[in-house]
Amino acid sequence: MDDLTAQALKDFTARYCDAWHEEHKSWPLSEELYGVPSPCIISTTEDAVYWQPQPFTGEQNVNAVERAFDIVIQPTIHTFYTTQFAGDMHAQFGDIKLTLLQTWSEDDFRRVQENLIGHLVTQKRLKLPPTLFIATLEEELEVISVCNLSGEVCKETLGTRKRTHLAPNLAEFLNQLKPLL
């Protein structure tokens, strides 16, 4: 596990939860995750769940993705998706508004790995350098990804070679995020 990335993710999650507490006097609330089982759920309303991060349980790697492509995945990606269970968190990096993707449960972790594999299949078919997404943007064809060759974080337009460098590594990217509520 990459300790710098794990700590940066935990620190951002704490900043996000603290901002939510300050604004709403509660743990984060999600309507999107209502009805989806998770160890993160503290309580449920009639159409939403309150959640708090929980330690990840299970194997702390995305080896299924590695096996599917017979490649080595950046250690930061293993760490990013297996440090904790949490809800997705809205954030800002510079002037970019994003939703930082998180693993909600063990079932969700399997789905995340399947989505990462699908993403890599498309990139391989289009002969694009491999990236692994970590966040979504309002523009549906853009994501924030980690380049699997360099470990750099970039904004990428799906299905194209268009990439904008954002940070030299995932820990630095996470450390620069500001919570958005």
UniProtKB/Swiss-Prot annotation:
InterPro entries listed in its UniProt record: Syd, Syd_sf
Protein's recorded name: Protein Syd
CDD domains: Syd
Major place of residence: membrane
Keyword match Cell inner membrane: yes
Family that this chain belongs to: Belongs to the Syd family.
Record organism: Escherichia coli O157:H7
Presence of the UniProt keyword Membrane in the record: yes
Membrane topology: Peripheral membrane protein
Location within or outside the cell: Cell inner membrane
Role played: Interacts with the SecY protein in vivo. May bind preferentially to an uncomplexed state of SecY, thus functioning either as a chelating agent for excess SecY in the cell or as a regulatory factor that negatively controls the translocase function.
Keywords annotated in UniProt: Cell inner membrane, Cell membrane, Membrane
